[in-house]
Amino acid sequence: ADKAAVDSMRSELNNLEMKGQIVIGEGELDEAPMLYIGEKLGTNNGPEFDIAVDPLEGTNFAANNLPGALSVIAVAEKNSLFNAPETYMEKISTKITEKNVIDLDYTVKQNISNLSDYLNKKPEELTACILDRPRHKEIIEELKKLKVNLKLITDGDVSGALLVTDEKYNVDIFLGIGGGPEGVLAASALDAFNCNFQCRFLFKTEKDKERAKKI
């Protein structure tokens, strides 16, 4: 499924009148044969663009014929998309754009309290979306203590962040730790929806720090 998505996306991008370059893709040149970081795409005529892609987010969804898989592309002017390294990021997304309501520096309890006050909802009327991962155990336990409704997702770092964009999804906040490249893709989409997305790197090892310094 992933190969089919890569092949199709690359073929279509190469048909566009542009000078495109992958800044977030399937990996470095030695890691991926196509849609690798630095690969040139397009007809080599027209405007210059940075391109960030995730040809298939939610591979397991697609493989099992389940809803939730996405093909994600962000295109922007040259030198305007951040080439995020393959490291973890702390993330929060909401529809609230006012300052000092939701912040990565706040505790989960403080963010939920602020969200509750701002939306005029009780904590038990709020819904938080988070990836169902062992690394989120403490956050999930805290949300349960606060009686916040949980939407646990098995995959979909980008799609999870986008659930705050429309009331039909009934998600007030997305939070947790996910991939850096996925953070850039989510930020690009959420900006178009005039939503609030905050992220910062969470380096687990010295190797992660060194990788980030090279970007």
Where do the protein language model's features map onto the residues?
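N-terminal subdomain of lithium-sensitive/metallo-dependent phosphomonoesterases centered on the IMPase/IPPase/PAP
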Residues: A1-A52, Q110-S113, D117, K144, ...
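Solvent-exposed alpha-helices and their adjacent loops that cap or buttress functional pockets
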Residues: N14-N15, K40-G46, D54, A62-L66, ...
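General beta-strand structural signal in soluble alpha/beta enzymes
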Residues: I22-E26, I51-V53, A62-N64, N83-A84, ...
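Short acidic, glycine/serine/threonine-rich loops at helix termini
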Residues: M34-Y36, N64-L66, A84-T87, I139-K144, ...
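DPxDG-like acidic metal-binding loop motif
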Residues: G46-E57, F61-F82
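Acidic beta-strand-loop-alpha-helix segment within the catalytic core
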Residues: V72-I153, I215
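Oxyanion/phosphate-interacting regions
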Residues: L163-I215
